């Protein structure tokens, strides 16, 4: 009898390891943390860790997840040993309760990292085709093993940010021709073709695509008031017209603009397939407390860096 009791207790203890928050919900936090959370690196990331622990997400997607600048300066780190991230994400994630860490997309010094309470694995890193397509910062496709056995496909990305195309010979002329918008659109098409485009049943499966798209959406044009054929909309027009993805924030806040950057744009998106959207119970852009971003008063002297980031986090929950 005693042995049976021990086995029952052990079973429930093991089950709790796979419990997904209150009421069985899975909480997902996305954030572009600007230069590897440069703001808090001199503080051993204590404020950052405390903020994440308070939110208690089950899955995190971090963009710009690499240390790049010396604390409180706009001076780039020169030696890899000076960079705490991305090499030590496992140690940092453990401080807010995550046991699994993956560098999902990385082609340069602006990687995307996933951390999770649940097992995860890389499926594909998307950097280009070696010919005429380059994904400047890289993108990635990972799978998270959810409680109960379901798989969540996670696509992370950070598209090219400039007005001119990557490697443009005449940057000024290319910017005038909207080369940056067109380059981002090619990146987006290639990323989708290499990820969700490989799954004929994607709309019936759990897919999430999130990141810094560096592009605004025509669904927010009630705010931007641009011509609908403006090249600024090319990236999200492609997603909306060629994939089953649903813009979560748009659906939860119809007609209500939700900025995700200090500059006042919404360029950080959470896209999910219909199968996942049906399970989403809440979604929001976080702009209070530690996430209340502002520009460093030193301005251009410090590259217009912000504290703690120039982007706001996006948080959503779903029930598997």
Can you name each region flagged by the protein language model?
Residues 63-162:
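Structured beta-strand-rich core segments of catalytic domains in phosphoester-bond hydrolases
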Residues 6-16:
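Bacterial N-terminal signal peptides
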Residues 3, 18-95, 107-109, 310, ...:
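N-terminal, active-site-proximal structural segment of metallo-dependent hydrolase catalytic domains
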Residues 32-34, 66, 158-160, 213-216, ...:
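Catalytic metal-binding/acid-base residues of hydrolase active sites
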Residues 151-153, 179-214:
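His/acidic metal-ligating clusters that form di-metal
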Residues 164-182:
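A solvent-exposed, charged loop/short amphipathic helix patch at secondary-structure junctions
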Residues 25-38, 124-126, 151-161, 177:
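Active-site-proximal beta-strand elements of phosphoester/diester hydrolases
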């Amino acid at each position: 009898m005693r042995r049976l009791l021990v086995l029952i207790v052990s079973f429930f203890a093991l089950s709790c390891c796979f419990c997904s928050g209150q009421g069985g919900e899975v909480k997902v936090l996305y954030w572009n943390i600007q230069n590897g959370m440069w703001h808090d690196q001199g503080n051993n990331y204590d404020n950052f860790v405390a903020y994440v622990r308070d939110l208690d997400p089950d899955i995190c997607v971090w963009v710009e997840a690499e240390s790049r600048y010396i604390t409180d300066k706009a001076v780039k780190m020169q030696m890899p040993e000076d960079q705490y991230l991305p090499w030590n994400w496992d140690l940092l994630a453990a401080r807010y309760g995550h046991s699994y860490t993956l560098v999902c997309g990385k082609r340069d010094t602006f990687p995307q990292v996933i951390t999770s309470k649940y097992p995860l694995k890389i499926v594909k890193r998307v950097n280009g085709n070696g010919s005429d397509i380059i994904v400047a910062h890289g993108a990635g496709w990972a799978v998270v093993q959810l409680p109960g056995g379901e798989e969540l496909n996670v696509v992370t990305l950070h598209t090219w940010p400039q007005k001119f195309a990557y490697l443009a010979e005449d940057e000024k002329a290319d910017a005038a021709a909207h080369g940056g918008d067109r380059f981002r659109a090619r990146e987006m098409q290639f990323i989708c073709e290499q990820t969700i485009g490989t799954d004929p049943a994607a709309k019936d499966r759990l897919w999430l695509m999130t990141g810094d798209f560096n592009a605004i959406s025509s669904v927010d044009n009630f705010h931007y008031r641009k011509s609908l054929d403006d090249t600024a909309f090319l990236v999200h027009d492609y997603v909306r017209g060629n994939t089953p993805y649903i813009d979560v924030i748009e659906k939860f806040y119809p007609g209500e603009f939700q900025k995700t950057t200090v500059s006042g744009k919404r360029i950080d998106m959470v896209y999910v397939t219909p199968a996942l959207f049906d399970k989403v119970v809440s979604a929001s852009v976080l702009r209070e407390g530690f996430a209340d971003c502002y520009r460093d008063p030193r301005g251009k002297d410090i590259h217009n860096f912000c504290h703690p980031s120039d982007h706001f986090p996006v948080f959503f929950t779903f029930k598997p």
